[in-house]
């Protein structure tokens, strides 16, 4: 049960009685309304909760000789990869997840418009027309029928005075929600670009690995032909042929697995961009070429370091969204408190009246103006419960903010560690490929000369293919570590001077 007190002070009169005192009263009433609408604060202004941020990243190096590109909205251009540029543009134009995020921004903007409209007076038009028929049933003039027509029209004015800040705090909360949804859209855009870039790198690495296995199979088939010639002349045994066939079958199995992985990467890009698989393959440079074809282009990511933690955490879209949600939750507490207090509404109306009955007509104007006061007397504790609920939501929002800061910090640290690891693996795997290639070349010549066994040749061939595959994976991981750093920092990075070097 919820009882309310209603006080209605209104003044009404006919047009002929409306003198200058009426207009003075109206001006005084509006002046009081403007004064009262200033509101009374029910709680302190919102202050961003203190955030536990590191003073520096654990893997941070010196900041000298760096080119700042923090917050670059088109950071993927730094990879100098036309396929990533084209597919990212396509994804931005037709990705359902991004479209949903942008629609939530528009929804929040519309909600802000609704909340903001409550701060302004509302003006409506009231009009009605009535035709009535009455019959006299008294003994004196029994059976006399009278028709009457009446009409009225005029504007009606209403305005809730924001005495305790309920409306203004609702507007603040709606504005904070809009800022949060805008940050969410930026985060979605950042993640989408990162996903496209990651998948392009993965597809190119997969294609390069596929070509490694094609070359390996072609080499094994040549060895098989030579072994069979030797077998016919008695220089080789059936065991040698079986060993070659075993290795060839293993390589063909690896190739089939690689082809499946490449198809999955193409499908992932199709889902992200809405482009056909043929368009994706054409952009990335993936073909069905056979052995002996050069590997596809793999971009080399520029050397990058994150900005200082305070800069990253202040601009990262996920952190911004969480902080704005906390601000909105704080404003909601004030709204819940204001809902427990009286409300003052100012209403005014002006109406023209016209009546015609019994052959005569009458027209006149009426007006009314006055405030009304409503307030809860008994609500069973619902108001207090709403305040506690709003306070709990604020506590949850601040906890989510702290969790987001910690997660962002962890992501940056992990990306930095992965950068260091990937760079070391690129160097070591490159050295491994050179050594394995030399070993295989020498072993192949020695086997043809009969100096070593087929087992030794196959072992060196297997090591060479594995070394090539490891280098491809390391280069892919290096690019993806850079992308992970960009995503983790919200593109708040700086570049070292060798930014233009790429393959």
Kindly label every feature range from the protein language model.
Residues 1-21:
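N-terminal secretory signal peptides that target proteins for export/translocation
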Residues 94, 101, 160, 167, ...:
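Amphipathic alpha-helical coiled-coil segments and their boundaries
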Residues 70-79, 126-156, 279-305, 311, ...:
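Small/polar, glycine/serine/threonine/aspartate-rich low-complexity segments that form flexible
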Residues 48, 249-278, 336, 422, ...:
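Short segments within alpha-helical structural elements
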Residues 2-5, 24-93, 175, 259-314, ...:
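Terminal intrinsically disordered/low-complexity segments used for targeting and assembly
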Residues 84-86, 107, 150-152, 198, ...:
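Transmembrane beta-barrel architecture of outer-membrane proteins
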Residues 99, 119-147, 158-187, 209, ...:
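Small/polar (Gly/Ser/Thr/Ala-rich) solvent-exposed segments
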Residues 167, 176, 182-308, 418, ...:
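Periplasmic alpha-helical coiled-coil/stalk elements that build and connect Gram-negative outer-membrane
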């Amino acid at each position: 049960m919820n009882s309310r007190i209603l006080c209605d002070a209104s003044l009404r009169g006919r047009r002929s009685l409306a003198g200058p005192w009426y207009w003075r009263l109206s001006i005084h009433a509006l002046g009081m309304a403007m004064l009262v609408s200033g509101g009374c604060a029910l709680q302190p202004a919102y202050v961003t909760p203190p955030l536990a941020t590191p003073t520096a990243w654990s893997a941070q190096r010196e900041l000298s000789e760096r080119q700042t590109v923090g917050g670059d909205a088109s950071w993927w251009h730094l990879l100098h990869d036309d396929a990533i540029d084209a597919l990212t543009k396509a994804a931005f134009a037709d990705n359902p997840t991004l479209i949903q995020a942008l629609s939530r921004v528009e929804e929040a903007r519309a909600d802000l418009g609704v909340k903001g409209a409550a701060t302004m007076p509302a003006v409506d038009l009231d009009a009605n027309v009535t035709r009535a028929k009455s019959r006299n049933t008294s003994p004196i003039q029994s059976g006399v029928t009278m028709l009457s027509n009446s009409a009225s029209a005029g504007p009606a004015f209403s305005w809730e005075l924001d005495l305790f800040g309920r409306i203004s705090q609702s507007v603040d909360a709606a504005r904070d929600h809009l800022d949060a949804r805008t940050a969410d859209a930026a985060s979605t855009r950042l993640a989408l670009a990162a996903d496209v870039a990651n998948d392009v790198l993965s597809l190119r690495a997969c294609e390069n690995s596929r070509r490694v296995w094609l070359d390996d199979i072609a080499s094994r088939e040549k060895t098989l032909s030579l072994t069979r010639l030797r077998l016919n002349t008695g220089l080789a045994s059936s065991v040698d042929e079986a060993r070659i066939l075993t290795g060839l079958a293993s390589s063909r199995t690896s190739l089939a697995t690689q082809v499946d992985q490449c198809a999955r990467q193409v499908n992932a890009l199709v889902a992200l961009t809405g482009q056909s698989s043929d368009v994706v393959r054409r952009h990335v440079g993936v073909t069905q070429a056979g052995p002996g074809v050069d590997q596809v282009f793999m971009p080399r990511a520029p050397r990058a370091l994150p900005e200082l933690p305070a800069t990253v955490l202040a601009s990262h879209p996920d952190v911004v969204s969480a902080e704005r949600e906390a601000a909105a939750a704080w404003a909601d507490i004030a709204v819940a408190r204001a809902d427990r207090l009286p409300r003052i509404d100012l209403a005014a109306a002006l109406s023209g009246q016209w009546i015609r009955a019994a052959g005569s007509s009458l027209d006149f104007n009426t007006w009314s103006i006055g405030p009304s006061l409503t307030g809860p007397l008994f609500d069973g504790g619902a108001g207090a419960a709403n305040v506690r609920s709003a306070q709990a939501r604020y506590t949850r929002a601040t906890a989510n903010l702290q969790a987001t800061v910690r997660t962002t910090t962890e992501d940056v640290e992990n990306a930095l560690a992965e950068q260091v690891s990937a760079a070391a693996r690129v160097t070591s795997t490159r050295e491994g490929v050179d050594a394995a290639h030399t070993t295989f070349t020498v072993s192949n010549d020695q086997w043809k000369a009969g100096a070593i066994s087929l087992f030794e040749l196959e072992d060196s061939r297997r090591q060479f293919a594995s070394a090539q595959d490891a280098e491809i994976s390391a280069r892919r991981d290096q690019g993806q570590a850079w992308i992970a750093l960009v995503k983790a920092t919200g593109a708040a990075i700086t570049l070292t001077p060798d930014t233009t070097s790429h393959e």
